[in-house]
């Protein structure tokens, strides 16, 4: 199987990665990818980007070398209603997102979280 895009990556901006956008784009191009989604952590994650970062994504070029860049976020689903930790004023600048369940699911435990998904309710 040949992959054409990496849809989940972090740069220095997320606080725990080690590469710049330019370095990551060069590595993606060297691997033969066509696109790279930069999905920095949303503000709820300690030590990561603030809202200001997401509100300024429109100034980042959408191409670096031969790689198409997709600006995005790794958001956290905060509760059963599907509320996420990136307000619309930041999320509206994102072209791509990935999501994870926040600590409410961890507190309830694995069984309850799975059962909740079976009932079409996000926990």
PLM-predicted stretches and their roles:
Residues 8, 28, 40, 69, ...:
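Divalent metal-coordination and catalytic microenvironments
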């Amino acid at each position: 199987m040949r992959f054409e895009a990496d849809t989940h990556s972090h740069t220095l901006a997320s606080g725990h990665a080690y590469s710049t956008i330019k370095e990551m784009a060069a590595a993606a191009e060297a691997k033969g990818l066509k696109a790279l989604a930069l999905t920095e952590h949303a503000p709820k994650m300690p030590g990561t980007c603030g809202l200001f970062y997401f509100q300024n994504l429109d100034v980042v070029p959408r191409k670096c070398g031969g790689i198409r860049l997709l600006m995005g976020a790794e958001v956290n689903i905060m509760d059963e209603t599907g509320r996420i930790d990136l307000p619309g004023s930041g999320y509206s600048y994102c072209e791509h997102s990935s999501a994870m369940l926040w600590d409410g699911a961890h507190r309830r435990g694995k069984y309850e979280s799975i059962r909740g998904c079976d009932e079409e309710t996000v926990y």
